[in-house]
């Protein structure tokens, strides 16, 4: 009995070779389409000047840089671009234990996320994508009970010690001791690197942040590495010693693409189901525009964090006011503005350039057997670049139209469209700014 491939090879005449060639061409086209289907596919702007309404099944995780979206919700900025949330009014309170499942099965379309947490799903599926970055996470830190009165990495550096010598001296008191860390896999690379490089040989005990915080406040822990920045901030405010953090490693450790520090760099953002993204491309652009509007607004007016604090406290186990949230953001995960996103997508020499960071993360996950080796590339996961670049392109096109409109005498209805376009432009909704400016110019 012939195999399928033998059957393909059997014909000898011209017709047979034509069939074979056609089959191979068809296979190539299908392969190209399959490849294209696993990338962000931009949509054309909608006709007309109205913004179509959209409801997003959205979830937030219990961290300061994962709940700032609540500011835009309370201010009505998502409503301005036609977006509402399911469940109303603020979406779902999610956590790291259920977020990937909720995204995969379609119970959520979009989630605030540390995107490497989605990578383990690539062993079986390639549905979850990182559609944007919001901040560089600097909260990975080894904190010590203040009663121990230990010297920090920064102090050893100030004394003149080199990187590895300072790290060994800092963590020497941890030799044979226990570090209480969070369950998230994203923390393991940081913990493993400092343990190996310092030679401390500490043991890891995994515990949820909320439980760890209770024990720390009771003085029943000596060394902790919480996942959540609000927990890190709360303990630092309570006097816990920041022995060494990820910022120290980035600043003083070895640099370059092959640096062992590269897999430790954490960039927080948004995860989404690719089926939703490529069926609602313009909704994604509008959502992201509000994200950058919030970031810009909080930098100009930090009192906006008062809107976020109660929501964050309600499921993070913290007791922060607006100033506490502001300090958490500024110290542990400063937000990235729209224009500063070029460091992720355009600046190949940047420490946080997505291809460098994600190549290192993927390599680390492969080494741990979490995902298959050689099957996944950064562009398979990170779709934020094409999305950001599309908004940059809409801004450029809108600038050109606005320049054209300045030299025109407009009817009142056209002038109203031009004025509204400026409002959308100021709120980073360059898609609708372009649509309205185009309508005004015609």
Cite the ranges covered by each PLM segment:
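Pocket-lining segment of extracytoplasmic ligand-binding domains
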Residues: 202-205, 211-315
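Bacterial N-terminal signal peptides that target proteins for export
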Residues: 3-20
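Short, solvent-exposed loop/beta-turn-alpha elements that line the ligand-binding surface or hinge
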Residues: 150-161, 251, 256-259, 338-351
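Bacterial N-terminal signal peptides
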Residues: 18-29
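Conserved C-terminal helix/tail region of periplasmic/extracytoplasmic solute-binding proteins
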Residues: 358-442
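Secondary-structure end/capping motifs
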Residues: 280-375
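Boundary at the C-terminal end of the N-terminal hydrophobic targeting segment
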Residues: 34-36
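Short, glycine-/small- and polar/acidic-enriched structural segments
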Residues: 38-208, 220-229, 242-250, 424, ...
